[in-house]
From Swiss-Prot:
Organism, scientific name: Balaenoptera acutorostrata
Record lineage: Eukaryota, Metazoa, Chordata, Craniata, Vertebrata
Signal peptide bounds: none
Family, per entry: Belongs to the insulin family.
Top-level taxon of origin: Eukaryota
Subunit structure: Heterodimer of a B chain and an A chain linked by two disulfide bonds.
GO terms for MF: hormone activity
Protein name as annotated: Relaxin
GO cellular component terms listed in the entry, alphabetical order: extracellular region
Amino acid sequence: QSTNDLIKACGRELVRLWVEICGSVRWGQSALRMTLSEKCCQVGCIRKDIARLC
């Protein structure tokens, strides 16, 4: 997936892309809930979360 696809992704779609990129990602339910509730679409936040979750 390209970075542009990640920038456009929000909520569940962003989580789906994370799973595709990272493979089997082990994350807590709290992290997943935070991602879905914040619906973070900002490049910096996405990069930070990918680094943290992957």
